[in-house]
Swiss-Prot record:
Domain S1 motif as annotated: residue spans: 623-691
Cofactor dependency: Mg(2+)
Compartments (UniProt record): Cytoplasm
Main location: cytoplasm
Compositionally biased tracts (Basic and acidic residues): 701-719
Pfam families the record matches: KH_1, PNPase, RNase_PH, RNase_PH_C, S1
The EC number(s) this enzyme carries: 2.7.7.8
Protein name, per record: Polyribonucleotide nucleotidyltransferase
GO MF annotations, alphabetized: 3'-5'-RNA exonuclease activity; magnesium ion binding; polyribonucleotide nucleotidyltransferase activity; RNA binding
Record lineage: Bacteria, Pseudomonadati, Pseudomonadota, Alphaproteobacteria, Hyphomicrobiales
One cellular component (GO) term of this entry: cytosol
Family: Belongs to the polyribonucleotide nucleotidyltransferase family.
Enzyme class of the recorded protein, top EC level: transferase
Residues covered by region (Disordered): 691-719
Organism: Bradyrhizobium sp. (strain ORS 278)
Length: 719
């Protein structure tokens, strides 16, 4: 019934198996990849005919994690998987980025890649297995894919690189780097690092590239057994259109791309395009060419003009040379009520970044396959349509916004203080208010400034820069601080963030079929120069975290109580802790190990809450005097609440320094009194006294009598 084919190799000390022919046989390509006991299914389906009216590759990649893969049932009312999680969105992008450049340019058939995690062994992260499985499924599917690609995760610890570190090993590594590419070149890099230098980062990329070659060979071996026949792809000859267009548009386009200001340049380019369309599609005449083909040739002409001008003259669209960074203006404290804020402007790219400090109540609970954990640092990136002078729909967070936010998160995360030293939940929001290239790196710079403005003690300020590439044959130019046009018309988006000491995040996306080690080395060196320059400009606004938190930020005090006292502080059904919060206005968080965090922007409220909690969690001391409240009056005495929730009995004989006939002659319910703890009886009941305490001053009368000097004896008579 099944015609199965499989290939198995040893990879990084664990078996990697690729199998096809048993599951999802109606898909164009389907591969089950098993690494350790992590199992992933990747499927590829492409439409039979091209999609009408599109001039781009209609590719969709969806990565999904099933709860059953980890032996779990989803939470929530419906008990099934819902909208994609952040991890699923990020891995979908991780798969998309290296495969997209390898499709034949003219492929316009709707293509969908679905990758499903079927089993997770809690050791091997499914993302690398998903990349490998997707590459294999595409290679078998018959779609015009110029792969296969391989991928690997690289760690770095004890001055050694680690291939595909397990989840436990990742806890101790200084680097989390994912690299993907073909047998000849690197296509994609994504990483977070603890301030590592350029040589270590480049070494990690090349280490990963070398060590995923066996995976590429395994996919080729599987394809030789099971690949489908290649699909036919129409080869379109646009040379006639190009020849006519050069005559009517080249000079005008060159003039347009000499305009430095983005909106003016776009208007000039738009005018040239209107002229071209009017020429090729005159009113009342049958057009010779398809509109999409003409538009595609126009875009190619734009790219050629920009690219060759840079290679031939060294001059870019806005007049800069390859290494110059645009003018930078940094401001902090721009929003009066925010805990920390910064406005970072670089040329025509601008980010307003705001930091908010919260408490344990604000931590984000992440429900992952590997288990639930709490996240105390959140970074959110927003890209509204007005930032590029356009109208658009405002709605849910887009994939791009999630991806850019995570890139900035990776850049900042390594320089944050440990949570036990700075016990706040920190949320950073970047509002991109203007964009003309590298808004994610503006977010990194603005986030660093906003965090320091809020008083978050970063290890060092962090900056980011986006690099571009123009590659024609053996000639290339690496561009620092790229514009939006240089990003769209160039061959590489290479983003590097870090401190003066090293790199904290590196992300690279290649739009061609890969780049060499030499180009990456040049780009990293040039990026360091740019990063140091940007850090210098940022230092004009702020060089380190402010000594004090913002005026409106909550203060957090941390202390410990005995674990057997946690129940008393919380109370039945949370009654006690709710009362503390309601009456003091402070926020209280108690952890299982007895760590208590009290937060409030009001110092008096914080002191009151801390005193209340400590009074409950600690034991009263015999001989000490306490303020109390009479809570119940009996014939034999009065019960007084004197130590948190603790009550004790003042026997009728201890009410006053005289004979008392009735308890109510001295006290009634609600009276505020001062009591001394005498001790505990045989049953553990608390014994209190009022008569040995001055009810006005709180003075210990018993101790006063003991300390008083003895009366001198009278002199004998006649002496």
């Amino acid at each position: 019934m099944f015609t199965k084919h499989s290939v198995e190799i040893d990879w990084g000390g664990r078996p990697l198996k690729l199998e096809t022919g048993k599951i999802a046989r109606q898909a164009d390509g389907a591969v089950v990849a098993t690494y350790g006991e992590t199992v992933v299914l990747a499927t590829v389906v492409a439409a039979k005919a091209p999609r009408d009216g599109v001039d781009f590759l209609p590719l969709t990649v969806d990565y999904q994690e099933k709860a059953y893969a980890a032996g779990r049932i989803p939470g929530g009312y419906f008990k099934r998987e819902g909208r994609p999680t952040e991890k699923e969105t990020l891995v979908s992008r991780l798969i998309d980025r290296p495969i997209r450049p390898l499709f034949v340019d003219s492929w316009r058939n709707e293509t969908q890649v679905i990758v499903t995690v079927l089993s997770h062994d809690m050791e091997n992260d499914p993302d690398i297995v998903a990349l490998v499985a997707a590459s294999a499924a595409l290679t078998l599917s018959g779609v015009p894919f110029k792969g296969p690609i391989g991928a690997a995760r690289v760690g770095f610890a004890n001055d050694e690189y680690i291939l595909n570190p397990t989840l436990d090993e990742m806890a101790d590594t200084q680097l989390d780097l994912v690299v993907a590419g073909t047998s000849d070149a690197v296509l994609m890099v994504e990483s977070e690092a603890k301030e590592l230098n350029e040589d270590i980062m480049l070494g990690a990329v090349m280490f990963g590239h070398r060590h995923f070659q066996p995976v590429i060979n395994a996919i080729i071996e599987l394809a030789e057994k099971a690949a489908k026949d290649p699909r036919d792809v129409a080869i379109i000859d646009n040379s006639a259109i190009e020849k006519e267009m050069l005559g009517i548009a080249e000079q005008d386009l060159r003039k347009a791309y000499a305009i430095a200001i983005k909106q003016e340049r776009y208007a000039a380019v738009g005018a040239v395009k209107e002229k071209v369309m009017a020429y090729f599609f005159p009113e009342g005449q049958e057009p010779k060419y398809d509109k999409l083909r003409v538009a595609a040739v126009f875009k190619e002409l734009e790219a050629k003009i920009v690219r060759w001008n840079i290679l031939d003259t060294g001059k870019r669209i806005d007049g800069r040379d390859a290494k110059t960074v645009r003018n930078i203006v940094c401001e902090v404290g721009v929003l009066p009520r925010a805990h920390g804020s910064a406005l970072f402007t670089r040329g025509e790219t601008q980010a307003l970044v705001v930091t908010t400090l919260g408490t344990g109540e604000d931590e984000q609970y992440i429900d992952a396959l590997s288990g639930t954990y709490k996240e105390t640092f959140l970074l959110h990136y927003n890209f509204p349509p007005y930032s590029v002078g356009e109208t658009g729909r405002l709605g849910g967070t887009k994939r791009r916004e999630i991806g850019h936010g995570k890139l900035a998160w990776r850049a900042i995360h390594p320089v944050l203080p440990p949570h036990h030293e700075f016990p706040y939940t920190t949320r950073v929001v970047s509002e991109v208010t203007e964009s003309n290239g590298s808004s994610s790196m503006a977010t990194v710079c603005g986030s660093s400034l906003a965090l320091m403005d809020a008083g978050v003690p970063l290890k060092r300020p962090t900056a980011g820069i986006a690099m571009g590439l123009i590659l024609e044959g053996s000639r290339f130019a690496v561009l620092s601080d790229i514009l939006g046009d240089e990003d769209h018309l160039g061959d590489m988006d290479f983003k590097v963030a870090g401190t003066e000491s090293g790199i904290t995040s590196l992300q690279m996306d290649i739009k061609i079929e890969g780049i060499t080690e030499e180009i990456m080395r040049v780009a990293l060196g040039q990026a360091r120069e740019g990063r140091i320059h940007i850090l210098g400009e940022m230092s004009k606004a702020l060089t380190a975290a402010r000594a004090e938190l913002g005026e409106y930020a909550p203060r957090i005090e941390t202390f410990k109580i005995a674990t057997d006292k946690i129940r008393e502080v919380i109370g039945t059904g949370g009654k006690v802790i709710r009362e503390i919060v309601e009456k003091t206005g402070a926020k209280v968080n108690i952890e299982d190990d007895g760590t208590v965090k009290v937060a409030s922007s009001d110092g008096e409220a914080m002191k009151a809450a801390i005193k209340w909690i400590k009074s409950i969690a600690s034991d009263p001391e015999v001989g000490q005097i306490y303020d109390g409240t009479v809570v119940k009056v009996m014939e034999f005495g009065a019960f007084v609440n004197f130590f948190g929730t603790r009550d004790g009995l003042v026997h009728i004989s201890q009410l006053a320094d005289k004979r008392v006939q009735k308890t109510t002659d001295v006290v009634k319910e609600g009276d505020k009194v001062k009591v001394k703890l005498l001790g505990f009886d045989d049953r553990g009941k608390t014994r209190l006294s009022m008569k040995v305490v001055d009810q006005t001053t709180g003075e210990d009368l018993e101790a006063k009598q003991k300390d008083a000097p003895a009366e001198a004896p009278r002199e004998a008579a006649g002496e």
